[in-house]
Amino acid sequence: MRQTKTGILLANLGTPDAPTPEAVKRYLKQFLSDRRVVDTSRLLWWPLLRGVILPLRSPRVAKLYASVWMEGGSPLMVYSRQQQQALAQRLPETPVALGMSYGSPSLESAVNELLAEHVDHIVVLPLYPQFSCSTVGAVWDELARILARKRSIPGISFIRDYADNHDYINALANSVRASFAKHGEPDLLLLSYHGIPQRYADEGDDYPQRCRTTTRELASALGMAPEKVMMTFQSRFGREPWLMPYTDETLKMLGEKGVGHIQVMCPGFAADCLETLEEIAEQNREVFLGAGGKKYEYIPALNATPEHIEMMANLVAAYR
């Protein structure tokens, strides 16, 4: 029987190549052109995107990226590369490639990198713990487009999500415990997930249920009372309703009600990025403290910590 050679493809959203208006514009154009992200009529969306959104948002977003940019690139790219390298060290006989839905390195370059290693089976791990059509679905779509152009197609194992994976929950719980040990136990642990339009959930995207699953399992692992753990949604865009409650509005309300000490974790982000380091760690800190809160701490993403890499290795083991 012929032995199968397996490769692993780590997939994430992507990032601009530089914290400049031009680079951000290229990235946002690709990102916001995906129907999985924005499914508005193209006749309405194209003029709005190209004539209003890209010219106005790109310079402002570039400044935000510049505020968190690292020596090796954007935080998402730096931590994603660290994850790829650490997993490759953990699994020395298995090629590991990194691909992004938008920007570089592309998913196509990652597939080609693995095929150049003569793999005939690829385990695809989208680094989105909670499934959504707008994230995991986008990886699936692009992978199908890539393989449709190939004469020979490798076997594919596609990991839909890992919202209640035991190792994932334990890694989150240990990260929370470390933060509590360092900063003291807060009045409230707030778990902020990236939002999606409410309409997507109404049409069948089970993302909110998967977020609730992670929240429930994490609270149980920590032994925390339900009233001391709250789930919210961040990063809304546009005018239509998104999943609620909104993170920023909730933090303002909690500060005004006299909640003194909050710690915030973003379980849906496998690596720190603009949305965690700038929006949550900085903008929302100002919202909470400005509303009367006394102490606010952001708990970093799992990034390339040993526990996170071990979780990835265990997760893909069943498919190798």
Swiss-Prot record:
Database matches in Pfam families: Ferrochelatase
Enzyme type, top EC level: lyase
Pathway: Porphyrin-containing compound metabolism; protoheme biosynthesis; protoheme from protoporphyrin-IX: step 1/1
UniProt keyword annotations, A-Z: Cytoplasm, Heme biosynthesis, Iron, Lyase, Metal-binding, Porphyrin biosynthesis
Membership in a protein family: Belongs to the ferrochelatase family.
UniProt-recorded name of the protein: Ferrochelatase
Localization: Cytoplasm
PROSITE patterns referenced in this protein's UniProt entry, alphabetically: FERROCHELATASE
Enzymatic reactions: heme b + 2 H(+) = protoporphyrin IX + Fe(2+)
Gene: hemH
Function field: Catalyzes the ferrous insertion into protoporphyrin IX.
Superkingdom to which the source organism belongs: Bacteria
GO molecular function, one term: metal ion binding
GO cellular component: cytoplasm
Binding positions for Fe cation per the UniProt entry: H194, E275
Single Gene Ontology BP annotation: heme biosynthetic process
Self-association and partners: Monomer.
Organism: Escherichia coli O8 (strain IAI1)
EC number: 4.98.1.1
